[in-house]
Amino acid sequence: MARWKKFPRVTDVRPVARDAWWSTLVFSATAAGLAVAAGFVMFGAFMYYDDEGYVLISLRNFVEHGGLYRDVYTQYGPFPFVFYAALHGLGLPLTHTAGRLLTLAAWGSVALLCASLAGAATRSLVTRLAVLAAVFVYLYVLSHEPTHPGGLIVLVVAALAAFGYRWLAAERTRPWAIAAGAGIAILLLTKINVGVFAALSALAWFLLHHRDDHVRRWAPRLLLVGGVLVPLALMRPLLGTPWVRTYALAFACSAVATVGAASLAAGRRVDGRELRWGLATAGAAAAVVFAAIFARGTTPADLLEGLLLGPLRQPVSFSLRYVWPPGMPAIALASTAAFVGARWLRRRGNAGIDVAVATLRLAAIVALALALMGFPNVGPDYRVFAFALPCLWLFVWPLAGEKQNATDARTWVGLLLLGQCLHVFPVPGSQIAWGSFLALPLAAIGAWDATVWLARRFPRAGGRGWRAEGLVLRLAVAVFAGVLGWRLTQLAARYRDGTDLGLPGAEVVRVPSDYTATLQLLTLNAVAHGDMLFSLPGMFSFNLWSGLPTPTHANVTHWFSLLKPAQQEAIIRALEAHPRACVIKHREHIKFLTQRGLAPAGPLDAYLEKNFVPAFTLDDFEFCVRQGRHIEPLMLAEALTLASTPSPDPARPENTVVRMVTLLPAGGAVASLEIAAPGEPSGRPLILNSADARLEITPANLHGEPVGPTASHRWPFRLNGPAIVSIFFDRNGRPRPSRGALIVLRDYAGGELALARLRE
């Protein structure tokens, strides 16, 4: 009996012992390595739907003009605007680079908080490492939407879980109440639905652990009813769709089982004093934020519309579909039935039910590990979210003999996760990971507790412990953490294969070379040919890169479904006042929306369709100008077959010319051109230089119109302004330029001077 007692008593709460120096070193080195890998992931992608640009331009407009909700459109609360305005006042530029660095800091902080949470419960280095790596992997979606309020949301939720667990385990309910009040206020003022979900979680924990026996007796019944009604009320506008009905059922079943499990051994911990502390802190935080936006022109009516009424209309305006696993309703009902049966057996003194729950916890975490191991080929969040709901009650269930304060602290994390699982409605995108990431530390804590509990419950014959098995288990967990970390570094390798975007505020963002060329080309042509820029759907990074204004300050990605008719009419009037206005359309994104029943429509969409036509098309992007206007695009070449005319040099026959209006960085001398097939920049390129190509240059203006005579020119060539560059060569026996090909202009040393594309 003495030997198995040497297992860590993870259910005991005691002061955290200082880690050995090597443990701290290993954890710190691992965290640093994962953060570096995450940094490369963060700067190694740019998403076509460009929520990043929408958020950034809204932040800039608020900082420069004020009028949040009145003039500056946003779907989110005022806190992110006040937060970024404060940082901007301290010197932070509102750029893609700065926003990505802040999102990276939030990403890493969430991983550290979750690892700290697991460490506080288990005192295990390998568990901390596994949770650290798992959360980095699970929240990789943060790299898809830098600067988005989702980064702030997961940071606040992680802090509520981590600090709340520590304080509740240490029986410090006042700090928990203060932190909960502040955190919930921030969430309410960032994304109101997420704040409401966190508030409901805190209320549930408060009622279940109230010192008043009468409150505690009625709390489970009240919460069970609430757990069924809340999803029905939230999802009422879309309950006619099958995926939403399944969602409401799965959540209601999970809420019934989780609240029921939490009520089995809830201690008497809080009363009105903690409630007053929480409300006072929340009120103080809200007052600071409200004062800041009211001082910048927002009225109470604007705030009511933007913070509450507008979000209530969003499920009807824009929603996506989550594909549940087959048989999910049956799984949810079976899980609830299993809980009811387990509770019935527990009340009758059946000790074996705890063994079953502990064993099921271990099975669940094995399934979780397998889901995580699918990264990066398969995003783990989609599968984890679905099964987190029916499994949640297992990790809240109090095992016999557990310390009360540890159980209460774990219950707090479980209830917080339960509430956040509603975040996925009505748009199951990145919200899936944001709403379910707490499943990782909770599963780690619950599985550790189950392992130790089972080891104590079933000591080895003769007093022998489970030391060897424990070492094997630790090794397996360490290998799991290592594999996840390695896979994150493999994903980070894409940064090495990309090309710097090189656009203002996004200089070090890297994407594939042909995509870089497309984004640069569209931005350059917007500067050259426009004085105002709009896009369909909203891609406002182009405005940030080009410096061109949007028609109004009401900017959002899906403006066709979220902006009111009056706001769309204001944009039409602004475009009418600018004959040189340009519009960029992304046909692939429009097709994606149309296939999901979200096709753009409304007065502004009809106006754009009638009055703007494509000047050129590239990679499903259409660069549109006003009807009847003609422009010559910059850095978009065409390859032409020459008529049978004699070459100036009979020894060098010519049958092809590549011609484009070119604008180069000052001082750069072009020694060669490389033309590679689209999507295959590393393949065999067509190389044109002084050895086999003749050069002619015609001075031009930004509109592509000649302003001087055409003259032959020697390689290398420099340009002092726009020019029409014509390169003559013989294509026989050489790679043929293909439509949409990437063109790289290089100097003598092989350095990249500029990128261009061949017409499609």
Regions found by a protein language model. Name each.
Residues 43-58, 68-86, 93-97, 298-300, ...:
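Extracytoplasmic catalytic/substrate-binding loops of multi-pass membrane glycan-assembly enzymes
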Residues 101-123, 159:
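Transmembrane-helix motifs of polytopic, lipid-linked glycan transferases
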Residues 75, 491-561, 571-576, 580-594, ...:
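Short periplasmic/luminal acceptor-recognition loop of GT-C membrane glycosyltransferases, typified by
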Residues 196-197, 380-398, 407, 411-413, ...:
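Hydrophobic/aromatic-rich transmembrane helices and adjacent perimembrane loops
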Residues 175-192, 198-206, 224-240, 283-290, ...:
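Membrane-interface alpha helices of multi-pass inner-membrane proteins
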Residues 143-153:
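Short acidic/glycine- and proline-prone juxtamembrane loop motifs at membrane-interface regions
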Residues 157-179, 187, 205-220, 233-234, ...:
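Membrane-interface transmembrane helices that cradle and orient dolichyl/undecaprenyl
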Residues 114-138, 154-155, 171-178, 305:
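Transmembrane-helix signature of polytopic, membrane-embedded enzymes
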